[in-house]
């Protein structure tokens, strides 16, 4: 049984994240979606909200795979968090050459620290290649339609959050 660790901020989860997760489930028997907690950053959604949105999105998109996916948080090195959860694969999605350059450096450093954990690069599909959570937040905050870029649960939460920032 192979366990994959898919780290990210997922603020919010996008269709690009979902695309990579579906691919990861074709390679690993279990995938841990790991939300990184960075004390210096102010996310739009709290950890609890992001975890709920991920779980709702997965229940809608992949109902038969729900038991194979778990959502956790981490605030330490990715390789240490992956090891703690018994993962032997780190999943990284790639949109373009810029992502590849950055991820190759990270994979090299991770391999030095944890040679027992392999990095698996998964290319984004054509439809999800331009999507970033940052752009989704920017477009949504300016009143743009992001329905093509995020799962329905995320769209609903984004709409509510941006209409009432206290949520």
From Swiss-Prot:
Instruction: Show the catalytic activity.
Output: (R)-4'-phosphopantetheine + ATP + H(+) = 3'-dephospho-CoA + diphosphate
Q: What class of enzyme is it?
A: transferase
The positions annotated as site (Transition state stabilizer) read 17
- EC number(s) recorded for this UniProt protein: 2.7.7.3
Where along the chain is substrate bound?
9, 41, 78, 92
Q: What biological processes does GO assign it?
A: coenzyme A biosynthetic process
Asked if the record carries the keyword Transferase, the reply is yes
Alphabetically list the UniProt keywords: ATP-binding, Coenzyme A biosynthesis, Cytoplasm, Magnesium, Nucleotide-binding, Nucleotidyltransferase, Transferase
Q: Which InterPro entries match?
A: Cyt_trans-like, PPAT, Rossmann-like_a/b/a_fold
Gene Ontology molecular-function annotations:
ATP binding; pantetheine-phosphate adenylyltransferase activity
Q: In which pathway does it act?
A: Cofactor biosynthesis; coenzyme A biosynthesis; CoA from (R)-pantothenate: step 4/5
Which Cys pairs are S-S linked? none
Q: Which cofactor does it need?
A: Mg(2+)
GO annotation, cellular component aspect: cytoplasm
Which CDD domains does this chain map to? Answer: PPAT
Kindly list the places in or outside the cell where this protein is found, as annotated in its UniProt entry: Cytoplasm
Annotated residues that bind ATP are located at 9-10, 17, 93-95, 103, 128-134
Partners and quaternary state?
Answer: Homohexamer.
Q: What does this protein do?
A: Reversibly transfers an adenylyl group from ATP to 4'-phosphopantetheine, yielding dephospho-CoA (dPCoA) and pyrophosphate.
User: Which family would the database say this protein is a member of?
Assistant: Belongs to the bacterial CoaD family.
Please give the name of this protein: Phosphopantetheine adenylyltransferase
Q: Write down the species.
A: Rhizobium rhizogenes (strain K84 / ATCC BAA-868) (Agrobacterium radiobacter)
